[in-house]
Swiss-Prot record:
This is NAD(P)H-quinone oxidoreductase subunit 3, chloroplastic. GO terms for molecular function: NADH dehydrogenase (ubiquinone) activity; quinone binding. Keywords: Chloroplast, Membrane, NAD, NADP, Plastid, Plastoquinone, Quinone, Thylakoid, Translocase, Transmembrane, Transmembrane helix, Transport. The chain crosses the membrane at residues 10-30, 64-84, 89-109. It comes from Angiopteris evecta (Mule's foot fern). It catalyses: a plastoquinone + NADH + (n+1) H(+)(in) = a plastoquinol + NAD(+) + n H(+)(out); a plastoquinone + NADPH + (n+1) H(+)(in) = a plastoquinol + NADP(+) + n H(+)(out).
Length: 120
């Protein structure tokens, strides 16, 4: 019941997906000309001269939505391998995943009741 060989294609995909951006940045770093100056340090606004300060402070409600999104996005990452090997793992893995999802639902209800998801 060793499930690691079933994920050979996943590991190959992960390796390729990691190497492509690393190689792109490496090639860019090697081939691109290096020039520093005041023009490089200014903010760029679609070809228009920048007006005002480029730093904008976001409201806290954006961070709360982002945090809840990340939590449930990570949940999907954990549930996907479980769903792929559901038949081999049996009822004990189903109960463990159910407990995991219930804990996340309880966290969502808590955030909802505390008003973390309220926009106004």
């Amino acid at each position: 019941m060793f499930l690691l060989p079933k994920y050979d294609s996943f590991w190959l995909f992960l390796l390729i997906a990691s190497l492509i951006p690393v190689s792109a940045f490496s090639i860019s770093k090697i081939l691109a000309p290096v020039s520093q100056g005041p023009e490089k340090l200014t903010s760029y606004e679609s070809g228009i001269e920048p007006m005002g300060d480029a730093w904008i402070q976001f409201q806290i409600r954006y961070y709360m939505f982002a945090l809840v999104f990340v939590i449930f996005d990570v949940e999907t990452v954990f549930l996907y391998p479980w769903a792929m090997s559901f038949k081999e793992l049996g009822i004990s893995a189903f109960i463990e995943a159910l407990i995991f999802v219930l804990i996340l639902i309880i966290g969502l209800i808590y955030a909802w009741r505390k008003g973390a998801l309220e926009w106004s």
